[in-house]
From Swiss-Prot:
Listed name of the protein: A-kinase anchor protein 5
Motif AKAP CaM-binding: where in chain: 76-96
Membrane disposition: Lipid-anchor
Summary of subunit composition and partner proteins: Binding protein for dimer of the RII-beta regulatory subunit of cAMP-dependent protein kinase (PKA) and also for the protein kinase C (PKC) and the phosphatase calcineurin (PP2B). Each enzyme is inhibited when bound to the anchoring protein. Also binds the beta2-adrenergic receptor. Part of a complex containing AKAP5, ADCY5, ADCY6 and PDE4C. Interacts with ADCY8, and enhances its phosphorylation at lipid rafts. Interacts with ORAI1 (isoform alpha) (via N-terminus) upon store depletion and in response to LTC4. Does not interact with ORAI2 and ORAI3 paralogs.
Lipidation (S-palmitoyl cysteine): 36, 129
Residue segments, region Disordered: 1-207, 237-313
Comment field on protein domains: RII-alpha binding site, predicted to form an amphipathic helix, could participate in protein-protein interactions with a complementary surface on the R-subunit dimer. The N-terminal region, which is highly basic, is required for interaction with calmodulin.
Region described as Tethers NFATC2 to CRAC channels: 411-428
GO biological process: negative regulation of adenylate cyclase activity
Name of the gene encoding the protein in the UniProt record: AKAP5
Amino acid sequence: MEITVSEIQVESKDETRSAEVRPQDERQEEKASMLCFKRRKKAAKAMKPKASSKAADAAKKCPPEARASDQPQRPGGAWDSIKRLVTRRKRSESSKQQKPFKAKLQSEINAEDANPSKKKAKSRLKIPCIKFSKGEKRSNHSKIIEDSDRSVKVQEAENLVTKTQTQSDDQATKSKSPQDVREDVSQKGDDEVCESNVNNSITSPGEKVISVELELDMGHSAIQRGTLILEKDTEMLEEKQSIQPQHVSPLEASDTEQELPVGSEVPPSSAVPDQQILEEARNGVLESGPDWKEHESREIVVEESKPKDTELSQELDFQENEITAEKPKPEESKRMEPIAIIITDTEISEFDVKKSKNVPKPFLISIENEQVGVFANDSGFEGRTSEQYETLLIETASSLVKNAIQLSIEQLVNEMASDDNTINNRLQ
């Protein structure tokens, strides 16, 4: 088990080295001739105290680059093993030579620190500093490019703001309040863009670049908020213009916008849902059951016939009571307290309907048209109507009795609950 673990560890190390070598080779291809200089003077860079962290990283990265250049050029065979021995000896000799060279460089660096006037004459030691300053300039250049991209986005946002302003001016030239809001937003956006341009002029050090980026982000977000506000204003104006021509002429609409821009929005919006509610109520009435249709047809026929007998008037009243009693919901039935009175009306009307035979012919014909569609003798009409009345009476009476029982049970339960609450409160 130990042998396998050691083998796995070795393989992982090789893999990590190869993974480190590949991005460095890519960097070599990008920087090309600059790296040759760095390889020759890596010892000088590594020992300098004033060199930046980037210099140290580059100096550390140089030896694996050399290894990477050697590794892919190794073919197999005994000749290669001899070459490797020779290259190892050369490396050991070069490392021995580098040690006194490093000591010399340290003495020279200390002398330069003591005499800063001599730095100008020694151009060899300035080369790596120049290289690293070039690298910093490149990073600043990339940041400046990013800033320029963001400034382009800010300019595009400004163009969108101006376009929305022109569209809104064309749509509603006389609306004042939304235009004032837009002018304020556009002024804020211009101020923020000016600040970002001023800060773009100072982008040489890294800290100022970061501050410029933050300010650009804030300006961009503020301009986005402004565009959102402008889009909302345009939507409100479009809704106004779509609703007002239905009710008011264009001249009157412009006058009302000048006087009461907020009040002109409310009445059409409140009128539309009222119309929808009325239409829904009408549809609900039309979609109700056949009993309601029978009731409407009966009422129309009765208005045309206008009977003079008191018994017929009682029957019609009873029919109305039946239909209104069948429709109420449980909430409405709870509110209807005089349920017993309705039951007494049904009993009286049952007695009247059974004994009454003075029913007009058009009244019976209307019922027959809705249900059968075939005309028959008067005796058939009378028999069928009496049966229908009986069934309606039984259904209504049963529904009313059920509602009354439910209400009584609920009242008892509520009373018991209230009594329990009072007892608990007293005990507490």
